[in-house]
Amino acid sequence: MTRSSIELGDVTPHNIKQLKKLNTVVFPVSYNDKFYVDVLEAGELAKLAYYNDIVVGAVCCRIDNTENQRRLYIMTLGCLSPYRRLGIGTVMFEHIMNFAEKDGNFDSIFLHVQINNNGAIEFYKKFGFEIVDTKEQYYKRIEPADAHVLQKTLRRTAPNSNSTATSTTANSNSRSKARQFTFV
């Protein structure tokens, strides 16, 4: 019996086409060229997920400095359907959570989820996210067009403090039980 390996890798000009293809298959919307240019500049905030050396998922985030807050926005986090429920989504989310904790200066992490994507909503609720708003007609050309805004509030550290943001982390069982669904 062999062990399965889940690893995250950088998005580079050499593999950006894999990300584009993955997003085309996983998400019901298409992303413009600017999205991919920005992803190439995102560093640790954009990762491909490999399962036994095969690209099966990706996470792409950006820093949002609006409303007098510094927030981390999850633009996409998804996995090919045959590879869901294997802990890949959890590994991608934990990478982003670790980034936010190490930085220590984020007020929250947030994302938009199509209102009928119950699997994604439940996935994020396991990590302490809450529905904080619903945006009507958020999506164009897909139904339903409304999106929930999910947010996980982080404790912002004081300047010159050595403490890190607090978070809810997955226990060892949640990794094997985590289910990742597509959303935008």
UniProtKB/Swiss-Prot annotation:
Specify residue ranges for compositional bias: Low complexity.
157-174
Name the enzyme's class: transferase
Q: Where is this region: Substrate?
A: 138-141
In the record, what terms sit under GO molecular function? N-acetyltransferase activity; protein N-terminal-methionine acetyltransferase activity; protein-N-terminal amino-acid acetyltransferase activity
Segments spanning the bilayer are none
Alphabetically ordered keywords of this record = Acetylation, Acyltransferase, Cell cycle, Cytoplasm, Transferase
Please indicate if the UniProt record lists Transport as a keyword. no
Would you name any one GO CC term?
A: cytoplasm
Active-site residue numbers: Y73, H112
Q: Where is this region: Disordered?
A: 157-176
* Outcome, altering Y124F: Abolishes N-alpha-acetyltransferase activity; impaired sister chromatid cohesion during mitosis
Where is substrate annotated to bind?
Answer: Y31, M75
Kindly list the positions annotated as binding acetyl-CoA.
Answer: L77, G78, C79, L80, S81, P82, Y83, R84, R85, L86, G87, I88, G89, T90
Highest taxon of the source? Eukaryota
Q: Which PANTHER family match?
A: N-ALPHA-ACETYLTRANSFERASE (PTHR42919), N-ALPHA-ACETYLTRANSFERASE 50 (PTHR42919:SF8)
- State its role: N-alpha-acetyltransferase that acetylates the N-terminus of proteins that retain their initiating methionine. Has a broad substrate specificity: able to acetylate the initiator methionine of most peptides. Also displays N-epsilon-acetyltransferase activity by mediating acetylation of the side chain of specific lysines on proteins. Autoacetylates. Required for the establishment of sister chromatid cohesion and couple the processes of cohesion and DNA replication to ensure that only sister chromatids become paired together. (Microbial infection) Required for optimal replication of E.chaffeensis in the immune tissues, hemocytes, and fat body.
Complexes and interactors: Component of an acetyltransferase complex, at least composed of san, Ard1 and Nat1.
Name it: Probable N-acetyltransferase san
Biological source species: Drosophila melanogaster
